[in-house]
């Protein structure tokens, strides 16, 4: 990277850390530290909610997803607006009325202590794992592409976040999230406009989108009923709905964002802001990926975007086979470029058919390389989607923009990780520590909150450092959530809507439901989005069964 890029990157990240630490260094009590003193306005809440959800994985993986498979991933978010409306009508008023610090406090009020501890513990498990992954995912990709030390990157990201989160608490998050969202969105718009401006002179936006459409990259909707297909209209509107309902309604990393609101109305409007803007934001990020695909239709793209995989294959006994495939791929791409540059391409069915034939041939060549990697490099990921956008950034963006886009990725990593640490701290202190050690002073709980923030940050760093022992972690954020969210959501739905069910019924229903969901996940019978729906349904049905059984016995 150029010195200017280093300056832009370091300056941007330093501003976030210093501003968040200095501006919010004074917290008088636990309410200040965990709920920002209930002084947040609606747009601060909205930006904080969006920044929490927008991890580095969003900006690394989503463009690569669109590059490889098109815009269909947008269906994942179709259930979100409906879920947010329900949360605003039913969930937020309950939390506001009870003046809770965490969502799980409500469950003790409705059921009992053990149900509160169970759901809080499920949250701590899944969000504790996710915190490590949100650090590891960008660190592993940046370390491979930039040739930086992985452990150094993990520690750098982790301790930067710990610093302002531990000192400033929720107020620091609300302040930094506004800056981070501005950096992230402006960075993606700049990248999009630069790519459009870099296309050949005779290819305007309309023609570019026609080329993308010819390759199936603009297929937004899939109405098929294939339950194994991860992203369809139906999985998004049902499984995505339940995932969003659980994530925004019961996950403390999101609940804590709107619990800091000045009033019920401010909290509701802040969450509704996310419902309105989330799909357009994801559309923008996916569109960037589609335009990266279009850009590479006029350039020779790497046959595989993971440079570590390519380097190791070239050093192995499969190098001659790889070199032959790479050479054939080079010729195939050149033939495609010649056809695309023809002025009559978009009007000629014959040329389009020839182009699609070459496109299929190129995909087969890429699959052959992935198979070689899978069969010969057990410690290297053959799925290179997550490397597409970062590879484009480093190889084609001008000086200054490289630093800005890397700042986008690191800002996203910091925003999501800081929210996770903040939520893990509040849940640990409010739901576990404070009930165990009651009647301590306010200053004691404030001190312990900072200690637990540091502790969870260290745990996240440790888990991120051992994450290389596992496969495909970059893809697992939503999968991990789906394993736990359905059960937790089922408990909350029963708590709010089915008043006759008592504590023991819901407690044992939740445990059994979670066991069933884990078995279903291991069996790999369904796309992971459906686990959210099944978990909620199992919890509700089992709690009704236990309630009926208990009433008959009585």
Q: How should these model regions be labeled?
A:
Residues 1-554:
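Membrane-embedded helix-loop-helix hairpins and adjacent transmembrane boundary segments
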């Amino acid at each position: 990277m150029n010195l200017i890029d280093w300056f832009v990157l370091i300056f941007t990240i330093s501003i976030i850390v210093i501003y968040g630490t200095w501006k919010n260094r004074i917290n008088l009590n636990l309410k200040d530290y965990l709920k920002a003193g209930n002084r947040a306005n609606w747009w601060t809440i909205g930006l904080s909610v969006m920044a929490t959800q927008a991890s580095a994985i969003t900006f690394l993986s989503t463009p690569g997803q669109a590059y490889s498979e098109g815009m269909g991933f947008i269906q994942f978010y179709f259930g979100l607006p409906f879920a947010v409306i329900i949360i605003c009508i039913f969930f937020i008023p309950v939390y506001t009325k009870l003046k809770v610090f965490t969502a799980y406090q409500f469950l003790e009020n409705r059921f009992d202590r053990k149900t509160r501890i169970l759901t809080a513990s499920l949250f701590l498990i899944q969000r504790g794992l996710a915190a490590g992954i949100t650090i590891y995912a960008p660190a592993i990709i940046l370390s491979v592409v930039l040739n930086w030390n992985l452990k150094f990157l993990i520690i750098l990201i982790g301790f930067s976040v710990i610093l302002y989160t531990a000192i400033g608490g929720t107020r620091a998050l609300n302040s930094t999230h506004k800056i981070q969202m501005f950096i992230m969105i402006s960075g993606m718009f700049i990248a999009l406009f630069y790519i459009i401006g870099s296309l050949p002179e005779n290819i305007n936006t309309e023609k570019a989108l026609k080329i993308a459409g010819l390759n199936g990259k603009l297929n937004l909707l899939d109405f098929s009923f294939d339950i194994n297909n991860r992203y369809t209209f139906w999985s998004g509107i049902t499984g995505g709905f339940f995932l969003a309902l659980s994530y925004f309604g019961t996950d403390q990393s999101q609940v804590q964002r709107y619990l800091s609101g000045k009033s019920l109305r401010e909290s509701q409007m802040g969450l509704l802001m996310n419902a309105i803007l989330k799909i357009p934001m994801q559309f923008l990020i996916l569109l960037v990926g589609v335009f990266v695909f279009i850009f590479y239709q006029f350039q020779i793209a790497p046959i595989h975007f993971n440079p570590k995989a390519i380097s190791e294959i070239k050093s192995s006994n499969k190098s001659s086979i790889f070199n032959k495939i790479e050479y054939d791929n080079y010729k195939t791409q050149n033939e495609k470029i010649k056809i695309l540059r023809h002025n009559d391409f978009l009007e000629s069915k014959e040329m389009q058919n020839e182009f699609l034939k070459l496109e299929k041939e190129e995909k087969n060549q890429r699959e052959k390389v992935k198979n070689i990697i899978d069969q010969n490099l057990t410690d290297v990921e053959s799925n290179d989607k997550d490397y597409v956008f970062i590879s484009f950034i480093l190889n084609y963006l001008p000086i200054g923009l490289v630093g800005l886009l890397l700042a986008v990725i690191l800002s996203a990593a910091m925003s999501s990780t800081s929210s996770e640490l903040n939520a893990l701290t509040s849940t640990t202190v409010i739901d576990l520590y404070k009930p165990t050690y009651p009647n301590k002073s306010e200053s004691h709980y404030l001190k312990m909150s900072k200690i637990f923030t540091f502790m969870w940050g260290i745990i996240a760093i440790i888990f991120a450092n051992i994450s290389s022992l596992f496969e495909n972690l970059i893809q697992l954020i939503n999968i991990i959530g789906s394993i736990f969210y359905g059960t937790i959501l089922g408990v909350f739905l029963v708590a709010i809507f089915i008043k006759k069910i008592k504590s023991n019924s819901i407690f044992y229903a939740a445990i059994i439901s979670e066991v069933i969901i884990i078995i279903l996940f291991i069996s790999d019978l369904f796309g992971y989005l459906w686990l959210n729906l099944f978990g909620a349904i199992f919890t509700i049905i089992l709690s009704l069964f236990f309630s009926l059984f208990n009433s008959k016995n009585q």
